[in-house]
């Protein structure tokens, strides 16, 4: 593990001197290796809840996110801070995906972003097995629930990677009823 504390990591990369609401508690849960559900309002700093601990830990964080625009924003933001992050987006050729995954295995990337649909690819599975994944972050986790308003079937298959990736999982969402929370935890194998 790195030498910096969560707060020092936050200050170094984001320039903030304190955490918002329950961020620090969530980060400590993640650092202790527990599966965690982060229920924070929009603008509540959900991404910091997985980015800070992943920077502190050896290895790479696998981030599953449904929105290409959000993925591109987060990757650009991390890169601007000098943090190595990349995304597998739908516009990439098989060869580009192949090269990107190799870079994640042999390079010192900290974040790999991809959609739940891209995560279903067998080649992606094979390459993930070769990576030292420190955390699985599932953004917009309410999309896993059939109770939710923007259900995405590919989200139901995210838990399959837990059979070959031994890493804690953090599920993040701004909106979840108690039923949706239970559903998220069940479907992600908490």
Mark where each language-model region is.
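Conserved nucleotide-binding/hydrolysis micro-motifs of P-loop NTPases
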Residues: 68-70, 92-94, 118-120, 142-143, ...
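Conserved nucleic-acid-binding Ia/Ib motif block in the N-terminal RecA-like helicase ATPase lobe
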Residues: 61-63, 68-114, 183
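Pre-Walker A (Motif I) flank of P-loop NTPase domains
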Residues: 32-38, 59-61, 108-110, 167
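Motif I (Walker A/P-loop) of helicase-class P-loop NTPases
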Residues: 45-58, 71, 154
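Conserved pre-motif I regulatory segment
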Residues: 2-41
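Conserved helix/coil segment N-terminal to the catalytic DExD/H
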Residues: 44, 51, 92-135, 145-149
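Walker A/P-loop
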Residues: 33-52, 62-65, 173-176
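Post-DEXD/H (motif II) to motif III coupling segment of the RecA-like Helicase ATP-binding lobe
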Residues: 129-190
């Amino acid at each position: 593990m790195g030498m910096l504390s969560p707060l020092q990591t936050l200050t170094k990369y984001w320039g903030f001197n304190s955490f918002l609401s329950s961020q620090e508690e969530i980060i400590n849960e993640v650092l202790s290796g527990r599966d965690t559900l982060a229920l924070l309002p929009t603008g509540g700093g959900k991404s910091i809840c997985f980015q800070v601990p992943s920077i502190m830990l050896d290895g790479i964080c696998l981030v599953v996110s449904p929105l290409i625009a959000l993925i591109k924003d987060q990757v650009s933001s991390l890169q601007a801070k000098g943090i190595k992050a990349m995304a597998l987006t739908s516009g990439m050729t098989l060869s580009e995906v192949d090269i990107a995954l190799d870079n994640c295995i042999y390079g010192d990337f900290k974040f790999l972003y991809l959609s739940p649909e891209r995560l279903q690819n067998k080649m992606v599975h094979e390459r993930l097995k070769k990576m030292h994944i420190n955390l699985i972050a599932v953004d917009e986790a309410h999309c896993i629930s059939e109770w939710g308003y923007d259900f995405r079937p590919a989200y139901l298959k995210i838990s399959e990677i837990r059979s070959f990736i031994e890493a804690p999982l953090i599920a993040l969402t701004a909106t979840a009823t108690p039923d949706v929370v239970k559903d998220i935890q069940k479907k992600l194998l908490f």
